[in-house]
Amino acid sequence: MPLEESGENTPLLRGEIISDGDTDRSRWRSIRVMYFTMFLSSVGFTIVITSIWPYLKKIDESADASFLGWVVAAYSLGQMVASPFFGLWSNHRPRREPLVCSIFINVSANIYYSYVYLPPSHNQIHMLLARTFVGIGAGNVAVVRSYVAGATSLKERTSAMANMSACQALGFILGPALQAVLSFIGETGVSVDVIKLQVNMYTAPALLAACFGVINILLVILVLREHSVDDHGNRIRPINYTPEERVDVPPEVEGDIDHIAVFTSNVLFFIILFIFAVFETISTPLSMDMFAWTRKEAVLYNGIILAAIGFESILVFLVVKVVSARVGDRPLLLGGLILIFVGFFMLLPWGNQYPKIQWTDINNNTIPPIQLAPTPASNSSLEPIGCPSEQTWCLFTPVIHLAQYITSDILIGVGYPTCNVMSYTLYSKILGPKPQGVYMGWLTASGSGARTLGPVFVSHFYTILGPRWAFSAICGIVLAAIVMLSAMYKRLVAFSIRHGRIAE
């Protein structure tokens, strides 16, 4: 198919050389399917994140916050293992194959999660396995990012990546929001005896995520087509094209990839995902300890808070698309890291007020929490609330106030989405027109490794030493990321700019 110039109007910019109108419409339909796939991946993680802790306690009373860290990390561990594999697969075969396979795994794993209460023993292990398989299914994020990077020109890419991040944020919003709505089903819910399924506030979100997955499989099969363009917008043959897709093949792209910049980008992405995984994991236990919320209150209120952060993120992505065109990607990345640092600094405990303590007697039975002032009788509950006395730091660590918590949420809600979209947008530009499947697999694995280590780190650190030490350590990590970005600032440039093909 000969290359020809488009008209003035393109989906995101004007005056670029692309293929004919039908092919271009097909290209953007396929990119939108990738947006939905990213949305599904985000929903698969967040739709249960606020209810994992109370669900875990319901199926196994002996589970502690340390095991919660492993359950949350299991998703990311599965994604970390699967991402390079799916990325390699997508470099050599049509992307439909790894996408359909991964989404099917995701659907099956969410159904498995809905049944983890059923076995007579080892329920917490079943939950761990279910979340691991959900994570393996989410390994297709590498395929999604490499597809969007390869199907957009250099000028289109920041906007396309911001759109993809907005879809990810929408999943981030709808996940906790749906969990908050479904919390009204209650812990008992409805029993479907024929298939031995309990539909309640813990299982309904996972079942809904499975339904989204079925829709996604149909879209991938019926709508997705392989498309690829170079940095200037010229259509090229994808490395994994099928014979019926006849396109002109340009000369081999000359120039090497800056592997130091690639390594730096992976480290920065790891840190960005690590610190947000810490924030996601600790929100429910922290709020239950500091604000004496019940399990149901923690699920509802944190669901609302995380949904609000998601809406904030979408606004951030809209602003980022405009601002990045004026100031560039790197200044936005640096600014986002500074906001995250301030957000975690706000979470450090100050003052001389202390949280309500949840005491236990010598038989390990819970005693109602200490009340420092008279409270209405309606506040008391059979469910133990407050900061557990077995966490010794509860006795001497000042309380974190709700205003601190909300302010921190707002700051991190601006800083994280900015860093997220800028980091992998920069990464895709550094790689240039080379096949990106494997490289995106490593980037996704890097982020998944962060999501694996982050929850384990914070659950142990928080349980043993408390929020003061946990959040001080996070502030130190963010500061190290700021220093690294500043030191490598000049190397983090697009492939075509580095080789002088496009002016910066």
UniProtKB/Swiss-Prot annotation:
Please give the Pfam families that the UniProt record associates with this protein. MFS_1
Q: Which residues cross the membrane?
A: 33-53, 67-87, 98-118, 124-144, 170-190, 204-224, 259-279, 303-323, 331-351, 469-489
What is the protein's membrane topology class?
Answer: Multi-pass membrane protein
Q: Name one GO molecular function term.
A: chloride channel activity
Alphabetically, which GO biological process terms does the record hold? autophagosome maturation; lysosome organization
Sequence ranges on the Cytoplasmic membrane side: 1-32, 88-97, 145-169, 225-258, 324-330, 490-504
Keywords on record: Glycoprotein, Lysosome, Membrane, Transmembrane, Transmembrane helix, Transport
Main subcellular location of this protein, as a coarse class: membrane
Q: Does the keyword Translocase apply?
A: no
Q: Where is this motif: Dileucine internalization motif?
A: 12-13
Q: Which GO terms describe its cellular component?
A: lysosomal membrane
Q: Which residues are glycosylated?
A: 364
Glycoprotein in keyword set: yes
* Membrane topology, Extracellular segments: 54-66, 119-123, 191-203, 280-302, 352-468
Record Gene3D superfamilies:
MFS general substrate transporter like domains
Its biological purpose:
May be a carrier that transport small solutes by using chemiosmotic ion gradients.
- Report the family membership: Belongs to the major facilitator superfamily.
This chain's protein is named: Major facilitator superfamily domain-containing protein 8
